A protein has these predicted regions:
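A generic secondary-structure signal for well-formed alpha-helical elements
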Residues: 12, 26, 51, 74-82, ...
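Long, internal low-complexity/basic segments
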Residues: 159-175, 180-186, 190-266
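Single conserved hydrophobic/aromatic residue that forms the stacking wall/gate
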Residues: 1-10, 14
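C-terminal cap/loop subdomain of S1 sulfatases and analogous C-terminal strand-loop tails that border
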Residues: 27, 78-176
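Structural micro-motif
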Residues: 43-45, 71, 174-175
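Polar, surface-exposed loop/tail segments
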Residues: 16, 58-121, 188, 196-205, ...
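Histidine-centered active-site microenvironments of extracellular/periplasmic hydrolases
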Residues: 15-66, 87, 235-241
Length: 266
């Protein structure tokens, strides 16, 4: 909820506050941003204002940080002791060190089952896709919205470029690597080019280490209980009923059609 901060600007409370401004990830009407691991879905603004020795008006910091770091920073500001297992750090702490890499992930969003992982260094974004046979435009909650409807219409009419059609509706590459200094919009996938082999291997190893060290839960399939709960939430909505949704839901659809769904629920 929006709060009129200016109304308390002169108060003692305001003078003691540290204000963090950040946003949700990705624009909802941009198909390649929200819920995906490209820059538009990962990069968010972070502005910090307040009475703290680490904050200087107009100072710009280009370090790689995550919103997890905001959590650690606010806990530290409140006087909490940060446990060692946290995968984040206090941005104002005396032991703060700029991160060499930050990580991002996408799993099931609403009823759309997927798994994507990404690691960002200062210059490169590396993306690992796991469901290679599922196009980026697999059925999802935005399918009844104009951007998705337009994209599907253009594809059916053969009016997309070869690159667009392959990117949105074709098989996904296992790996993607983009030079964020030269290719901000991530159009040219460098993963298969020999000149970038060393960077590909470096980022691949960094991501694999993070997956193992963090015990990334996306390594494990969701249980039937979780999938059934998702099916229950969406099964009566037109956008789900008319879609060729992921095969993981087939058992629930078949049981429902055969009147065995109640028995399956027990």
């Amino acid at each position: 909820r929006s709060t009129p901060l200016y109304s308390s600007a002169a108060s003692d409370v305001y003078k003691r506050q540290v204000i963090f401004f950040f946003s949700d990830h990705g624009h909802n009407t941009s198909l390649r941003h929200k819920q995906f691991c490209y820059e538009g879905g990962m990069l968010v603004p972070l502005i910090i204002k307040g009475n703290h020795s680490a904050i200087s008006p107009g100072r710009v910091v280009n370090d790689l940080v995550t919103l997890l770091d905001v959590g650690a920073t606010t806990l530290a500001l409140a006087g909490a002791e940060l446990p060692n297992y946290l995968e984040c750090q206090n941005l104002f702490g005396s032991e703060y060190k700029a991160a060499e890499y930050v990580f991002g992930a996408r799993d099931r969003c609403d009823y759309t089952i997927d798994r994507i992982r990404t690691v960002r260094s200062d210059r490169y974004r590396y993306i690992r896709n796991y469901y290679l046979d599922r196009p980026l435009m697999q059925p999802g909650y935005r399918d009844d919205r104009p951007p998705s409807m337009d994209m599907r219409r253009l594809f059916k009419a053969g009016e997309l470029t070869e690159y667009q059609a392959e990117h949105w509706f074709g098989l996904r590459p296992r790996e993607e690597l983009y030079d964020m200094h030269a290719d901000l919009h991530q159009i040219n996938n460098l993963a298969s080019l020999s000149d970038f082999r060393a960077e590909l291997l470096r980022h691949r190893e960094v991501l694999e280490n993070w997956i193992n060290d963090s015990d990334d839960q996306g390594q494990h399939s969701e249980s039937d209980v979780q999938l059934r709960a998702t099916y229950e939430l969406w099964k009566d909505r037109d956008i789900f009923k008319s879609a060729d949704v992921n095969p993981e839901y087939s058992k629930f659809r078949e049981a429902s059609a055969n009147k065995n769904y109640k028995n399956m629920m027990n």
